[in-house]
Amino acid sequence: MNTTVAKRINFQNEYKAKHSDKPIMLFRDMDFYFTYNEDAEPVGHILGASGKVAHAEDFTYAAFSARKLDEYIPAIIRKGYHVAICDGAIC
């Protein structure tokens, strides 16, 4: 696992430990949003063929184009999830 992914997963775990609503975490990386581990499967299911779910050696992730954020956030929320977006240097 590369250090960026490890930092994001760490941040995700810490954030979820502090927030009882356990939001789906979306991390911006250039032109894509990524989500990891337990968040990847529901996001992939909600987005269907538009979302990519992949299994790396030691983590699972889903990704989608940043251009689709305004379309996908409501779809995720309609399924009953909360969403937190990390779009900056701390991520």
Please place each PLM-identified region on the residue numbering.
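Basic, polar low-complexity surface loops/patches
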Residues: 1-91
